[in-house]
Amino acid sequence: MSYICVIGNENGIVAGSDSRETIAPNKFLDNRQKAFVDKKQNLIWACCGITKYNGIDYIDVVESILRDTNLSFIEKIDRLQIMIERVTKECYNYIGNGSAMDILIGYKLKRKILIRMNIQNGEVKRNTFFAPLAIEGGSGKMIMNKLPLKDYNHLSLKELEVYVKSRVQKTIDKDKEISINDPTHVNTIGGKVRTVAL
């Protein structure tokens, strides 16, 4: 399912992801963009999970909603939640196995707000935090030690970006190592590391 993370502090917010997309069982592409920024709207986000279903690319739909300048921030979040709830529930009911999407959003106001939405089989967990903080999503968070709860304020924006790149790369490497040692493990985290900064 991939790995995404967002870290914010007083200097800004950085989002990072791997670039692997599962197109069929054990068939992958390694050029999927999952981390985005819209500097005009002070938004940054990363998403992973159910990518395409019934001919619809849901990462593109998430991007379209978050870039829509006619919606307020709250309207965007609510619209995302309703849409992904519906599609993960429908997919789960049709396919019969787990269907999930993680969306991490950073919003730069006077304080930086980080939102984590985990939608699994139509059930939503949504949390809002204030930076400095790090949040993560995707299956990669299950194979790595949790991102440390520490004060990230001492890091410059460039240092935050280096930290995020390193974290994503370590997760890609760990998933590959697990798949080498366990033939039943599907290596769904891979490709190049992508980061964006706000």
Describe these PLM feature segments:
Residues 118-124:
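A short, sequence-level motif marking secondary-structure junctions
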Residues 104-110, 196-198:
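Short hydrophobic alpha-helical segments used for membrane anchoring or interfacial signaling
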Residues 91-94, 110:
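Divalent-metal-activated hydrolytic enzyme cores
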Residues 111-115:
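Structural motif
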Residues 8, 37, 107-108, 119:
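Generic beta-strand structural signal
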Residues 2-92, 125-197:
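Conserved short S/T/G-enriched processing/targeting/catalytic segments and their helical context
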